Amino acid sequence: MSRYRGPRFKKIRRLGALPGLTNKRPRAESDLRNQSRSGKKSQYCIRLEEKQKLRFHYGLTERQLIQYVRIARKAKGSTGQVLLQLLEMRLDNILFRLGMASTIPAARQLVNHRHILVNGRIVDIPSYRCKPRDIITSKDNQKSRALIQNSLESSPHEELPNHLALDPSPYYKGLVNQIIDTKWVGLKINEFLVIEYYSRQTN
């Protein structure tokens, strides 16, 4: 299944806020309507919706998400929490959380178009897994800097998660301090329902 490129507002009306996909918010009456329907949902539908929230927020294909679940299952610790850490430490998501891109699709474009450096080297793979002590900057040209500055100036000034830092001078520089603590994940999600959904597909 390919990455979703359809109407974004349609997805947030059904699934709720997906800040990685769009900075728009569902209307309050839409939220109430969805809550009133929730009592009629089967357990399968509830698990499916949690999986879809994760997939659309991070901009993944179905195959990519299944692969991340498989990796998380082989790691030590809670599979659900490891899954969230893997997704949060992707380069496209780190750029989004730093405010250097307004959405994850916008961050993916920055990376694909070779505007982003990690530790002084161009990285053009959005799924690149960032690690502690990584330094993320724009390429040393006016266009790359302007794209990031415009995003930072237009994005809401939310508190950065504690695993990241942003140095504004002389040019914007993002720092990865540590692996994310899952309480700082930027999406309201029940990751355990996602693992349950995939319990048969990934055996």
UniProtKB/Swiss-Prot annotation:
Organism encoding this protein: Ipomoea purpurea (Common morning glory)
Any GO MF annotation of the entry: structural constituent of ribosome
Gene Ontology, cellular component aspect: chloroplast; small ribosomal subunit
Source species, domain of life: Eukaryota
UniProt-listed GO biological process terms: ribosomal small subunit biogenesis; translation
Keywords from the UniProt entry: Chloroplast, Plastid, Ribonucleoprotein, Ribosomal protein, RNA-binding, rRNA-binding
Name under which the protein is recorded: Small ribosomal subunit protein uS4c
Similarity comment: Belongs to the universal ribosomal protein uS4 family.
Keyword Lipid biosynthesis: no
InterPro entries tied to this protein: Ribosomal_uS4, Ribosomal_uS4_bac-type, Ribosomal_uS4_CS, Ribosomal_uS4_N, S4_RNA-bd, S4_RNA-bd_sf
Lineage: Eukaryota, Viridiplantae, Streptophyta, Embryophyta, Tracheophyta
Matching HAMAP family: Ribosomal_uS4_B
Residues of the S4 RNA-binding domain: 89-150
